[in-house]
Amino acid sequence: MSQVIDRIESRLNNNGLAFARKPLVIGGMAMEYYGMRKAGADIDLVISNEDYLALALKYPDKRKDIYGDLGVVLHEFEIWRSIALLDYDFLLKDAVSEGSLLVVSLDRLLFMRVCAMEVEKYKKDLLTMKEYYYEHFRNKMFLLEAETHTASYVKAGGTVFGGKYMDE
């Protein structure tokens, strides 16, 4: 199991936090889980509405509301029922199950960063994610083929018509 998951599960246990449905890891911890960058000190989770209602009832003075996104802030945790009013069920699509947690899918994480790209930190995350996608998902054979024509692309402004490469 991932060190990120171990760390989050340990902190949840130490704080006596338990949920009916698996919490969804988002934000910096998800970025670290995928190996894109180190997370900050906070741990962001999205939980089901039912779990949120129980948590909010237990910790009424720890509730937080950001433009209708309701959450509870406990220690290093920010635990939300939605992000940009996108709820647990929406963010759950293609999530990765790890122990007692779920990790938001790469595609949903990317979408969340796009939604917040006016914030400089998230704009940097988008650039990091773009490089991650290129490194992990580009067709390596196509990339090698394209690299043989780099000189032609430079001379032609990036586009070569009719297979007329000018590589020499």
Task: Name each region found by the language model.
Residues 1-168:
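Compositionally biased terminal segments of proteins
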